[in-house]
Amino acid sequence: MAIDTDRGLQTQVIYSVYVRAHTPEGTFRAIIPDLDRIRSFGTDIIWFMPIHPIGVEGKKGSLGCPYANRDYRSVNPAYGTLEDFKALVDEIHARGMKAMIDVVYNHTSPDSVLYETHPEYFYHDAQGRPANRFGDWADVIDLDYSNRELWDYQIESLRYWAGIVDGFRCDVASMVPYGFWKAARTAVKQVNPACIWLAESIHLSMGCEARRLGFAAMRDSEAFDVFDLEYDYDIREVFDRLLHGRCPLSHWTDMLNYQEAIYPDNYNKMRCLENHDQPRIASIITDMEALVNWTAMLYFLKGTTLIYAGQEWADRHQPSLFEREPIDRETGMNLMPLMKKLAAAKKTLFTGEDSFWATADDARKLAVMERFSSRRHSVGVFSLLGESAKVKVPLPDGEYLNHIGGNTVRVEGGRLFCDGTPLLLCEEK
């Protein structure tokens, strides 16, 4: 983590909004009436997926992908005007929340303003054509950060937006040089000293493949020096295998413990069950009792919690990045009361100083997780199948309040009965 990172971020909740999909109108101003609801279940920060104009050349689908950015310094007219966006941010601030925007600094659309004015800022293949370095991203071309004038342009754009919003989610941050991010953080600090920096660090396999092909890819340990928090994609592939039954729960909990062992004391991983690049969790975990446990476990994990808009309704459909597909608010499911309790517990029981440990019962797919602070020892018990079981827990015998369900749980002989609902118990010091 950056030396000046606010550890309080670890107890906060980010809510990810795709403007096109969030309302039937798909505009900035249409989001304003929804802000009170978003805040009501514990949201601290709203992250907007890219708000900039989308390129036409090579676009995917009828509307194009928001990550094929045409102009870093303006907003997508389909969403509204810059004044509309500023009004939205003002309303977010009025409710005590913060706003972040996506910055896509690895690439642009082929017809971007930047390519039209400065083609020398871009990567070119062996035939001299603008291209992307690898991956199936036919609607974008990669930037070339060996050109220091590009740094100046990008940093000036960041300084501009830092005067409006509270932070940046940096797309494919690992593929942009460490030195650039370090310079950008220093420059932006002059405009907004409290700016939040979130890195979309890349999957382990993608980083290895990039280096195999001769391209630099920033490692997570480097990213922690200049970002406040980063994705947990270093172990996401293990998590995905767990979700689909291709590895035991203990493999993933071992990876969580490995992160705790190797990263700086103040490390912060953004934890999510789903995001715009991943399938909806409710499309995989279809049993509601099980989904409640997975959701409770998400909030217990060490790190900032991410909720992707629609997750609170257990929406099973992943909105297309290339079309207009409003999220489904009529699923008949409502996880917001649960999320409100979990967010409150995260803020009141956990701290940015906590240490973490996790164990697993593979046969019953049951996780027991611990958080340790100077004030309390917290234990979470999560039955990921939603089934009842007798569970061994690292707590003295006695009665404990379940901070999720509100019921009392008794520990006898170092064991308790889990009825299939998530448990959060605390031993005060």
Task: Describe these PLM feature segments.
Residues 2-15, 19-44, 50-162, 183-192, ...:
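Substrate-binding/active-site clefts of carbohydrate-active enzymes
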Residues 13-15, 46-48, 99-101, 168, ...:
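Hydrophobic faces of well-ordered beta-strands that scaffold small-molecule active sites
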Residues 100, 167-173, 281:
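Short catalytic-loop micro-motif centered on adjacent basic/acidic residues
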Residues 171-264, 269, 297, 316-350, ...:
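Active-site-proximal helices and loops of the catalytic beta/alpha 8
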Residues 359-395:
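Carbohydrate-binding surface patches
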Residues 401-415:
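Solvent-exposed beta-strand/loop surfaces of large extracellular or lumenal domains
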Residues 411-429:
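C-terminal beta-strand-rich structural cap/linker in extracellular carbohydrate-active enzymes
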